Amino acid sequence: MRPSGRQPDQLRPVTLTRHYTRHAEGSVLVCFGDTHVLCTASVLPKVPPHKKGSGEGWVTAEYGMLPRSTHTRSDREAARGKQSGRTQEIQRLIGRAMRSVFDLSALGEHTIHLDCDVLQADGGTRTASITGAFVAAHDAISVMRKKGQLTGEPIRDFVAAVSVGVVDGVPVLDLDYPEDASCDTDMNIVMTGAGGFVEVQGTAEGTPFTRTEMDALLGLADHGIRTLIGLQKQALGL
């Protein structure tokens, strides 16, 4: 039995609350159990230097954790004067995940800037961020469409992410913090609605994992992400 009482193939309770803040073109509070992340999508009338004059847009992301989102307070990265390697890795992952399902040429020379701020962390903050950020980006696209800022349909598919791992020899879906801290294997999987893999991040924490275990983890991730994309569609009324 898992610490949470869940079955091996069971997600934590997941909610996606749209229009959570007032000013951003898209905003979503995403909750994977006790992991809560605020995802906002801002539409900016500019693109990075490598896109200027191309007629194409860009989608990028920033990620951060509130000082007391974890058990003990951590300093703000702004106070330290630099971002950690972990923060940089996660925000690049979020950006790649979003761009995998966007037609940038349909955005014109606009940037969708996603901000994912972890309010409370209990494992899986990057996967929750990706899942919530897509819904926020979808709402931002709706605002752009109403304003006539699009040159086509930029969203080609849905995208979501989930963690999987081997805990006490058992492959499980959507690890919370106690499981993440004690697992033998930890993976973060990003997939599209069509079932394509965008990213597979996997690490053995001590005991190498087998091909059989890896196949089981990918199967769990596929099951979980299909459920998450269903919840995204439900939240968007699609």
UniProtKB/Swiss-Prot annotation:
Binding site for phosphate: R86, G124, T125, R126
GO molecular function (one): tRNA binding
CDD domains xrefs: RNase_PH_bact (cd11362)
UniProt region (Disordered), positions on chain: 67-87
GO biological process: rRNA catabolic process; rRNA processing; tRNA processing
EC number annotated for this UniProt entry: 2.7.7.56
SUPFAM superfamilies xrefs: Ribonuclease PH domain 2-like, Ribosomal protein S5 domain 2-like
Keywords linked to the UniProt accession: Nucleotidyltransferase, RNA-binding, rRNA processing, Transferase, tRNA processing, tRNA-binding
The protein's enzyme class: transferase
A Pfam family the protein falls into: RNase_PH
Protein transport recorded as keyword: no
Tree of life domain: Bacteria
InterPro entries assigned to the protein according to its UniProt record, in alphabetical order: ExoRNase_PH_dom1 (IPR001247), ExoRNase_PH_dom2 (IPR015847), ExoRNase_PH_dom2_sf (IPR036345), PNPase/RNase_PH_dom_sf (IPR027408), Ribosomal_Su5_D2-typ_SF (IPR020568), RNase_PH (IPR050080), RNase_PH_bac-type (IPR002381), RNase_PH_CS (IPR018336)
Subunit-level organization: Homohexameric ring arranged as a trimer of dimers.
Role: Phosphorolytic 3'-5' exoribonuclease that plays an important role in tRNA 3'-end maturation. Removes nucleotide residues following the 3'-CCA terminus of tRNAs; can also add nucleotides to the ends of RNA molecules by using nucleoside diphosphates as substrates, but this may not be physiologically important. Probably plays a role in initiation of 16S rRNA degradation (leading to ribosome degradation) during starvation.
PANTHER family: EXOSOME COMPLEX COMPONENT, EXOSOME COMPLEX COMPONENT RRP41
Family: Belongs to the RNase PH family.
Full protein name: Ribonuclease PH
Organism: Ralstonia nicotianae (strain ATCC BAA-1114 / GMI1000) (Ralstonia solanacearum)
Phylogenetic classification of the source organism: Bacteria, Pseudomonadati, Pseudomonadota, Betaproteobacteria, Burkholderiales
Name of the gene: rph
